Amino acid sequence: MPIAHLPGELEMYYDDDDFSDPWTQAEAVILHHGNAKNGRLWYAWVPLLARDYRVVRVDARGFGRSSIPAPVYQWSLEGFATDLAHLMDHLRIDKAHLIGETIGGTIALQFAYQFPDRLHTVTACTSPYKFRGIATYIDYYNLVQERGVEAWVRQTAHRRLEPDRSDPRHSEWYMQQMSQTAQHVVLETLACLATVDLTPILPRITTPALVLVGEHSAMNTPDRTRSLAELLPHGRLVEVPGASGYVQHSAPEQCVAIWREFVKTAR
């Protein structure tokens, strides 16, 4: 099992897939999952990318198959970004394309701010950039505290994969993956996120940035998507036509096709 032993007592699981021509040096694409998730959720992206890129899927600290900190760990976006930089060092990846989904996209933007020289591009899929003062995250915290992780996951599942637009088996598997996350990790990361607002740093991110969202997603609101792209100096918003829910999971083929075109023009 591929585990990187990294600073901060982190044993970080990752998948590393590269089916590019072996006599070439493929650029790396790093896929970062969201809160209470893991790298498995990116399964559909790998065959669409790995013929031309080295594709690394991470399980962030506390999630999936990576080590779980004891309660009261000091969570922060800066910490997640630093963990990722350490993994890149371990894998000898000097520079990469970074793609994050939901909170993974928020982390990706933080990484672009902290480590601009290590990225070719950054992509945020269905990702918020402002949490402070938004009651939704406090409501999520209370739900997880009172009823547990699985209750929260199932009660909010329709936001990720809309029932009438997705395979119910996909949705069930998705919920099972999320429900494995330790309760204290979900609570503590939600509490951390409730203090986050990336607004001050976004105008200072110089990396070419793609903001992806489903055309019919409940997350496709001007204050979440259009404003994010406008705050980024080199930001581009693409609403995936006809897509709903969390577009990175509901329409992976469309997302990858859009991303490939974005990378061509970003060079």
How would you describe each model-predicted region?
Residues E215-N220, G245:
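Acidic catalytic loop of the alpha/beta-hydrolase fold
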Residues H234-R267:
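Catalytic active-site module of serine/aspartate enzymes centered on a nucleophile-bearing elbow/loop
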Residues I205, V211-V213:
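Short beta-strand/loop motif that positions the catalytic acidic residue
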Residues R132-A135, R147-R204:
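Conserved alpha/beta-hydrolase catalytic His-Asp/Glu region
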Residues E78-A96:
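Conserved acidic catalytic loop of the alpha/beta-hydrolase fold
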Residues H33-N35, A96, G100-T102:
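Conserved alpha/beta-hydrolase "nucleophile elbow" surrounding the catalytic nucleophile
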Residues L10-P69, Y73:
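Conserved HGGG/HGGXW glycine-rich cap/lid loop of the alpha/beta-hydrolase fold
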Residues T106-Q114, R118-G148:
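Flexible "cap/lid" loop of the alpha/beta hydrolase fold
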